[in-house]
Amino acid sequence: MRRSFAFKITLLTLAWLLLAIACQQVPAKVFWPVVFGALTTPVALGCTALLALYWLRRNWRVALLPVVALALTWPQVQRGLALHAPINEKVSTKNQELGGGKTLRSTFFAPPPNTVSLLSANVRIFNVYAQLRDPDFASSIGFIRWLAESPADVLCLQEYYDEPGGSKEDGSVFRSERALGRANGRHSFVSTTLTNAIGAEFGMAIFSRFVIVRRGVIPFGKLSQNHAMWADLVRPAARTGRGRPDTIRVFNLHLQSMAMADADIAKATESRAGLRQKAPNLLRRFRNGAVARGAQVDTVLACIARSPYPVLLAGDLNDPPYSYTYDQLADELQNAWATVGLGPGFTYNGRLPGLRIDQQFAGPQWQVRGCRVHREINWSDHFPVEAVYRLR
C-alpha cells in the first residue's frame, strides 16, 4: 500500500513538472496565472530529485522514471542551479580604497585578446536621489570609479544617470559619461529617456573599447526607462585572432519591473490585515508586469533575428529563469551563467532575496568562457554580472 501511494505521488510529481515547464512557454497575455505555474518549476525539480533518491533505495525500475525525467529536463536544472566545474580562465585582482581604512577587493577576468569581456549592471541612477545617497557621495563615487577601472571591453548599464556639465550641488560627481567613456578609452552610446531641469540625463548606456559604428534604440511603446538599445562594435584585427577585423552586435535591455514598493511587500507579509490591504494592488502590478515583459521580449527577439552579426545581450529582465521572458531568450541564445556558472548566481540585492533577474546571453556563434556575479558590489539593488566570450 505504501509503495502504491508513493508511486502515485511520483506520477503526480512528474505531471506537475511537465506542466510547470509548459507554463514557461505561455505568454502572460494569453492566460496570466501561468506565471505562478512556471515559478513552481524549481520546486517540482527538487521533488523529482528526492523521489529519485527514494526509489533508488527501494526499486530501481521505478527510479528510472524520475531519473529519466531529470535527465530530460537537465537544462531546466541548470537554469536555476548551474553545476559546472570552474573554467581555468585567467583573472586579475584590483583593490579600490574606500576611505576609513577600508579596501574593496574585486576579481575580474583577464582573458586573452581574442575574446570579448562584458560587464552589465543596473546602477540605480548611481544613488543620486536623496533617499539613496550618502552624505559624502561615497557609494556614487565608488560605483562610478569601480566601473571606470574595470577591465571589461563593454559595459551595459541600466538605470543610468549622467550630469554632462556637473551641477552646483553635486560638482562633477555624476559626470559619469566622461568618467566611463573618454577618460577610460571607451566609446559611449547613451540612450536618454529623460532630461531634468539641471540637464541631467536618465536612461541606459553602452560603453565600448571597440569603435561603435551603428546604434539604435528599441522603444516598447512610449520611450521610458524600460526599453532596449543596441550597438554594432568593430573589433580590430589584433583582437579577433583571425587576422581581420569583425563586427559584433550588443543589446542592452531593461524590461518592465513589477513596480512593487518594498514597504508594500513588507506590510503584506506582516499580518493578515496587511495582506488583505496590499495583496490586490500587488497582484495587479505582478500581472501587468508579466504581460508587459512578454510583449517586450518578443519585440527584442524580432530585432535579434534580423541581426547580421554575432549577438551578445545583457540586461535586467526583471524575471527569474523560470519565466516566459527567460524561456524565449534561452530558445534562441545561450545563457552565460547556465552555461558555465556554478551555483544559483543570485543577482538581486533587494528585499526579495534569491533572485537571478540580471542576465547575459550569447548567440550560437559564441563560446562562453566564464561568468561571475560581483556580490562584493552592494551600491545598488542589483549585483553586476561579468562574462567572457570568444567566437567559435
Regions found by a protein language model. Give the residues of each.
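Residue-level detector of structured alpha->beta connecting loops
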Residues: P151, R209-V211, P308, Q365
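His/acidic metal-ligating clusters that form di-metal
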Residues: R239, R244-T247, F251, R272, ...
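Residue-level marker for buried hydrophobic side chains located in beta-strands
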Residues: S117-L119, C156, L313
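Transmembrane alpha-helices and immediately adjacent membrane-cytoplasm interface residues
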Residues: L45-N88
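Stable alpha-helical elements in mature extracytoplasmic
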Residues: S139-F143, S172, S176, R293-Q296, ...
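Structured beta-strand-rich core segments of catalytic domains in phosphoester-bond hydrolases
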Residues: L70-T115, I125, I144, V154-A263, ...
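Metal-dependent phosphoester-hydrolase catalytic domains
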Residues: R3-R57, A63-L64, V217, D232, ...
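Acidic/histidine-rich helix-loop elements
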Residues: V35, S120-S140, D162-K168, A259-G289
